[in-house]
Design a protein with these regions (language model features):
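N-terminal helix-turn-helix
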Residues: 2-84
Length: 87
């Protein structure tokens, strides 16, 4: 008997990861409208995701130019993971 892999959907998680991956493409960051356009999503939909990502410190909002950028949290998580593994 062949086992088939079940595909599960987690749209909110995918949206958040899409935002993180997009922000990784530019050191200048993106405005909320640019993120929505690039990801083919509504501005309201992106707004909610951005607020959560900022509150969890995965991304930062620059009030001077109103652009979102990645924070160093992902780097810190990767570093923590690599130091916790024994060689």
């Amino acid at each position: 008997m062949v086992k088939t892999k079940k595909n599960y959907s987690a749209p909110a998680l995918e949206k958040g990861l899409d935002i993180i991956e997009l922000l990784s493409e530019s050191s200048d960051g993106f405005s909320q409208a640019e993120i929505a356009k690039e990801l083919n999503r509504s501005v309201n939909e992106i707004y909610r995701m951005l607020n959560i990502l900022v509150s969890r410190n995965y991304i930062e909002f620059d009030t001077n130019n109103e652009r979102y950028k990645l924070s160093i949290k992902l780097l810190q998580l990767g570093f923590n993971s690599s130091t916790s593994k024994s060689v």
